């Protein structure tokens, strides 16, 4: 069982290591934190922390650095403390959507870069899966005698366009009729939607085109992976350069692979989650990922991740993500 003094020393070692990136000795701790105890007492407490596997020796110094277990203990305490704090939530994404005329891709790109600037680490923002999204509007526009453009507008502000060839002899009145019906009645329950279409459309070409449009919408949404927007990749590279150059390539490969998508898709709560080193992947030991959710609206949510070295300013990052609605 860790004592109050040992916890204070562990906190000091973690925070000093984050700030200075150097092993910490007993005299340094006393000097920086104005501890009213002898170096011998500090050394004894550090020995106890080492036996608990919370701190460890390095090959190049007589000082100690926090281990993954020590950082995990420190982070768990932080999460416990912040879970009881009420925060004034900031609806920054809503502001960015308005500023960018509801162009959600631009808004999310700017959101990722803003979070990176505030946290000073790399950030990932994942667009909500369209299967969670609601189609607000469907439009059918005839481009020429054979080409029709299908436009889908989602509640998140995202817009999808599909160009397709159709030889149906339908004018704009017919196309608007189909589009308006689908806007009002579209459902992922295919059986119910098909029944509604068949009971509503008496003209064969309207019926065929309506079913064709539904097929295209389902195919388009089903094939889409969640878009990921990254901000501050260079900040991650710079941070890793200072600690372990050899770890940069596997970390970047992980971030750019499906593994990071799978990790983020597992987030189902707005609570802050922190994964450290090999908790993320057996091949990783130098980064931490702090994740949470953000809101497009009351029901539609996406994921946020802040990625940095294991010697991360966790308190700043957790407070930042706690304030995002």
UniProtKB/Swiss-Prot annotation:
List the keywords (alphabetical): Repressor, Stress response, Transcription, Transcription regulation
Query: What processes does the entry annotate via GO biological process terms?
Result: negative regulation of DNA-templated transcription
Family annotation (NCBIfam families): hrcA (TIGR00331)
Family per similarity comment: Belongs to the HrcA family.
List the HAMAP family hit by this protein, alphabetically.
Answer: HrcA
Function noted in UniProt: Negative regulator of class I heat shock genes (grpE-dnaK-dnaJ and groELS operons). Prevents heat-shock induction of these operons.
* Identification of the protein by name: Heat-inducible transcription repressor HrcA
User: What organism does this protein naturally occur in?
Assistant: Staphylococcus epidermidis (strain ATCC 35984 / DSM 28319 / BCRC 17069 / CCUG 31568 / BM 3577 / RP62A)
